Curated annotation (Swiss-Prot):
Belongs to the universal ribosomal protein uL30 family. GO terms for biological process: translation. It comes from the Bacteria. GO terms for molecular function: structural constituent of ribosome. It comes from Aquifex aeolicus (strain VF5). PROSITE patterns: RIBOSOMAL_L30. Residues 62-125 are annotated as: Unknown. Signal peptide: none annotated. This is Large ribosomal subunit protein uL30. Residues 1-61 are annotated as: Large ribosomal subunit protein uL30. One of its GO terms (cellular component) is cytosolic large ribosomal subunit. Pfam families: Ribosomal_L30. Gene3D superfamilies: Ribosomal protein L30, ferredoxin-like fold domain (3.30.1390.20). Part of the 50S ribosomal subunit.
Amino acid sequence: MSKLKVKLLRGLAGESERHIQAVKSLGLKKRGQERILEDNPLVWGNIRKAFHLVGVAYRIDFSGDIPTVERDLSEKPDYTVINKNGVYTNGKGVYYFSRITDLEDFLRKKGYKKYKNWKGEEVEL
């Protein structure tokens, strides 16, 4: 089964107990902490519950005609996360989105009509 890297992008202070439990079930406790987890419905359900707090790491290569989106599974911890125009990034090509629709909206705003996803399929926007 494939894997995905999940990062806690915002702190838990002031959040409802439901959101805190969803984040803790992902194994995240502190802001900036990352975990590599199995890609399964249980994990995605918890990501959806706390979508405003966590993000899945994607590496986007804009060098070709259409951007190539890969899931970033690097083991090296990345402590630098900045919020550029509402999008969380490390400034080195890794972007954090909690929903695929957010990723597609980001690419659409950059002027792209399609992209190649991590499965090698071309996806129309």
